[in-house]
């Protein structure tokens, strides 16, 4: 079973007298910075000079804001809370020459360390604290005296105190109130990518589109198809999210139970499982990472084309029209 750390297992004293530099002030960055500051930690936010709007927002929130290299200079913990694909360049240009002996390089996702896009010097600690929820939720739960479950991992333990410092950071953002699960950079990275590709993003999106196309091709109205295969999905996902898969089965009709349990395996077959294994292998071997890195180096031609195709799918047009009928939703 996984090791889970709670409030009693973490001590903010490991951040006493230290400066935590938060690189970025987006979804996670602003939450980490504000929570740590409210926990009594000395925080500085590092931002590019050209990002005036974010700079002003951070200062309005009461943060000390500096240019990237200045913020990192002399910091004891440097948290890289910017998108994966820009991290390596920012690290090379603004961070690596500012790392002092015994400092900690902190991440919220393991991609760049696991796939060697960032290779820290041996004289620093490397750790990860990854909340399993978006930044606004991390902030809101902290303010309410609660927390969001998170992951913690140590990749490099130069000082011998990397886990203690990482847990102090986790406590500072409120994570230990809920529980912090110990993992590794390898496990977090590979399972995160697998979930995105096979289930959460790739698998669900393709299932919805194919279901919609099947109904429309058979002559059913696209409006009805949209409601049945996309709109109602939230109702089912909420039931699973709140109480697990069996909770969903307990809540739906007997007809839905029987039809789902007898037909679902005809959609997701052993061939599907084999493709899942292939995708996992591509992640484990680094094949996907190399593909994605090269795609970015080439200017993202495949990525941009695929995104355009998604945007132009018929389900998007009909969805926009139907959502206009739903006053409880934010307008597109």
From Swiss-Prot:
Could you state one GO biological process linked to this protein?
Answer: L-valine biosynthetic process
This entry's comment on the bound cofactor is: Binds 2 magnesium ions per subunit.
Name listed for the protein in its UniProt record: Ketol-acid reductoisomerase (NAD(P)(+))
Tell me if Transit peptide is a UniProt keyword of this record. Answer: no
| Residue ranges of domain KARI C-terminal knotted in the record | 184-329
Which residues bind substrate per the record? 253
Gene name? ilvC
The positions annotated for binding NADP(+) are: 25-28, 54, 84-87, 135
Its lineage opens with:
Archaea, Methanobacteriati, Methanobacteriota, Archaeoglobi, Archaeoglobales
Species the sequence originates in:
Archaeoglobus fulgidus (strain ATCC 49558 / DSM 4304 / JCM 9628 / NBRC 100126 / VC-16)
Q: Which reaction does it catalyse?
A: (2R)-2,3-dihydroxy-3-methylbutanoate + NAD(+) = (2S)-2-acetolactate + NADH + H(+); (2R)-2,3-dihydroxy-3-methylbutanoate + NADP(+) = (2S)-2-acetolactate + NADPH + H(+)
| PANTHER family given in the database record | KETOL-ACID REDUCTOISOMERASE, MITOCHONDRIAL
């Amino acid at each position: 079973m996984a090791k889970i750390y709670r409030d009693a297992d973490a001590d903010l004293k490991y951040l006493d007298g230290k400066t935590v530099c938060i690189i970025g002030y987006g979804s996670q960055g602003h939450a980490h910075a504000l929570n740590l500051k409210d926990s009594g930690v000395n925080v500085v936010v590092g931002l590019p000079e050209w990002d005036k709007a974010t700079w002003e927002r951070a200062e309005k929130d009461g943060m000390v804001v500096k240019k990237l290299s200045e913020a990192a200079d002399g910091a004891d913990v440097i948290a890289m809370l910017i998108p994966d694909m820009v991290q390596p360049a920012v690290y090379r240009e603004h961070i690596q020459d500012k790392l002092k002996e015994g400092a900690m390089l902190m991440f919220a996702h393991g991609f760049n360390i696991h796939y060697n896009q960032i290779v820290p010097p041996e004289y620093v600690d490397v750790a990860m604290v990854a909340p399993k929820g978006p930044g606004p939720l991390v902030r809101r739960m902290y303010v309410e005296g609660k927390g969001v479950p998170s992951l913690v991992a140590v990749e490099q333990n130069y000082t011998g105190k990397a886990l203690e410092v990482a847990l102090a950071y986790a406590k500072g953002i409120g994570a230990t109130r809920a529980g912090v699960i110990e993992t590794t950079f390898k496990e977090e990275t590979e399972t995160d990518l697998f979930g995105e590709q096979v289930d959460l993003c790739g698998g669900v999106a393709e299932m919805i589109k194919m279901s919609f196309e099947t109904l429309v091709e058979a002559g059913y109205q696209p409006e009805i198809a949209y409601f049945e295969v996309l709109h109602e999905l939230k109702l089912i996902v909420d039931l699973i999210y709140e109480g697990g898969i069996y909770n969903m089965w307990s809540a739906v009709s007997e007809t839905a139970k029987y039809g789902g349990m007898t037909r679902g395996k005809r959609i997701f077959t052993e061939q599907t499982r084999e493709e899942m294994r292939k995708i996992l292998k591509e992640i484990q071997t680094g094949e996907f990472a190399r593909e994605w890195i090269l795609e970015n180096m080439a200017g993202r031609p495949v990525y941009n084309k695929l995104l355009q195709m998604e945007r132009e799918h018929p389900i998007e047009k009909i969805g926009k029209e139907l959502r206009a009928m739903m006053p409880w939703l934010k307008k597109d």
